[in-house]
Structures are given as C-alpha cells and as structure tokens.
Amino acid sequence: MTPVRNQKDVEKAASRAIEALYGPEVKDIKVRVLLPFPNEHKQEGWDANVTFLSKGKQYTVDLLIDQEDGQITNARLIDMMTPL
C-alpha cells in the first residue's frame, strides 16, 4: 500500500477502510478530525475521526492509520444514530 502523508491520503485510506467494513452502500464519508498519532514529535500514523451515512444511519468511526503503508491498525465505532 502507499504511504499516507497528508489529509488527502488519509481521506482515500479512510474511504477504502469504511467501504471494506460497512459495504459499498456508504455515502457522505467525511474526515471530521485528523490528529497525528501518537503525537506531533514522533508521528507514526494518523488518528482520523470519520463520519458517514449507511442504511439510514449516521456512523462515527475512529481509525488509526499507519503513515508508512496506509494500513488500518485500529477501527472503533464511536456512535451510530438516526440523523434528524
């Protein structure tokens, strides 16, 4: 896989991961918060907070993305709700 160096690369990696986890019917994938991981001084990856819609529900997922190869090292569901 390709290195993930900036927000555009993170958006591509997050989109691929969300579609792999939740299926191709997801839409409106947005990276809401993007932080270096573990911190700014020794960055090894990205902590991305991502929202998207699927089957009438809005999901918020936290993804840890390795900077060197774009692998998702952790994916965690934060919230699932019916949008207003």
Label each PLM-derived region with a short phrase.
Residues 22, 30, 43, 75-77, ...:
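Generic alpha-helix signal with a bias toward terminal, lower-confidence helices
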Residues 1-35:
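Short, non-transmembrane alpha-helical segments in secretory-pathway proteins
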Residues 20-24, 55, 82:
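Hydrophobic alpha-helical elements and their junctions with loops/disorder across both membrane
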Residues 62-84:
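A short, surface-exposed interaction/processing loop segment used at functional sites
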Residues 29-68:
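Exposed beta-strand-loop-beta-strand "reactive/processing" segments of non-cytosolic proteins
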Residues 25, 37-39, 84:
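Generic low-complexity segments that are intrinsically disordered, proline-rich and/or Lys/Arg-biased
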